Amino acid sequence: MNPVEKLALLRVEMKKRHLDAYVVVTDDFHASEYVGAHFKAREFLSGFTGSAGTLVVLPDAAALWTDGRYFLQASQQLEGSGIELMRMGQPGVPEIPAFLRDHVPENGWIGFDSRTISNDFARSIGEKTREKRIRFAGDEDLVDLVWTDRPALSCEPLWELDVQYAGLTRREKLAMVRGKMKEMGASVFVIPSLDEVAWLLNLRGNDVLFTPVFLSYLLLEQDTATLCVQREAVSAEIEAHLKSDGVTLAPYDDIYRLVAALPTGTRVLLDGERANYRILQSVPESAEVLDRTSPIQLMKAVKTPAEQENERLAHIKDGVAVTRFIYWLKHTIGKEPITELSASKKLESLRAEGEHYLEQSFDPILAYGAHGAIVHYEPTEETDIPMEPRGLCLADTGAQYLEGTTDITRTIALGPLTDEEKRIYTLVLRGHIQLGAAKFLHGCMGENLDMLARTPLWEAGLDFNHGTGHGVGFVLGVHEGPERVHWDVKRQKRHCVIEEGMIFSNEPGIYLAGKFGVRIENLVVVREAEVNEYGRFLALEPLTLVPYDRDAIDLSLLSSRDVELLNAYHAKVFAAISPYLSGDELEWLKEATEPVQFC
């Protein structure tokens, strides 16, 4: 079936239930960024494969909202579907709640699966549509009636992350969170986020592609903890370990029953941005809801010394693999056929040679030429193209190791470049290395740092429509909060001070539609630089250790400071990576990291 046929079947079900609109989001029951195959309802209906987007289906129309990363991709994939593309943040584009207010009649009904809609999103719709007395119907997943061959819920075995990697035991983490609960006046903490449950319990799984988590909820009290999980995924050994730390098991779907049974006067802590609407609706009226940012977010974001050291080890392994890949690509292009997909598979195979490699950390982006202008392009059998010994290849990839999570982008010259390609590459590189060299007082937030990366681009009248940096989990999600580097404070729902031990990305880019794209990305860890009478200064240490492409740099555009920073980084790369290379690969790395001279 194509999207037109699928939407027609969905509208039949909507009509049976007298629904005036049906909302289909990208999320699973846990507001995860990446979701298992079972939860890809929006993709199934619309054909749009991006990782962010919301579909609204009306009786005679449909619209899909997505952000700037996916404007080009969505416009291509939605063609002929009858679904209007809503470019979020652009002039004249309504937000979803306002759209629903304007298109649903008075006393009408909006349907959705309330397990996939966040409490915050449902509340925003309710506030916007209240005057028209529009009601919600959230008990049914109508997509399930249309998607006849829908994949089952994943149920992969859990595994324990040893304290040598985590740095804190399960008991220590539980005590930390219970301490925060006391501070916040909460008697119960409902934890629906898969990464938070995994972090807190030092457990990992394989229920979500690219993210080693497992389908679960945790109900935490001062003296008890109940893990709602698919029982067949938990070995007897892990169950015994959990029990010894005061954690008991319950069926996965029991979370709603357990919340509904909370006694009168219970003060329930939950994060409305992460808790689904059905959880909130299950809370008894006699209980008090404390809608707060989850305290686990910040705990998880500030990496332990053990996590930081393990991440350094992971990035050396990753740096070796990516460096070998760049060498292979530059020396093979034009001699053997190489496509975007075959290059992607080559890089994955090189990473898999590393000890303790688990999986990729997201869908790899190998984008040649004009495909590089599609910010989150992912090559498929339908879109794959051959690469030629000229122009640029944008490679944004990452991996999961026992020692940590990686995310790196390198834009690679495959042969001769135009002056425009070199100019854009060099401007992006300047912003990237200037942010990487930041030294700042504690108390700064991501929006304070963002302009360091954008200034060389803004001075040239250029910009990019995505964040400059995102937090990264430890053997968890490649994107996490609460830290974020973005200049536009209007887009920031929650603001976060940059703390020592945080790990986030530094990834400016420029994308020229129909031509090419350039993005350069390192992960950095925040460390203390100095403390003096002015305060506590922090700095950024690069974790990613892979050479930039000297073949793409216009040296005349670099300042003396830029040259100094570039050479210092390349010296660090050579020192870390060279012991693991030999022969021609080592000789190439020497050349790739040779100091450049200021023009």
Predicted regions and their residues:
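Active-site neighborhoods and metal-handling regions in enzymes and metal-associated proteins
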Residues: 1-599
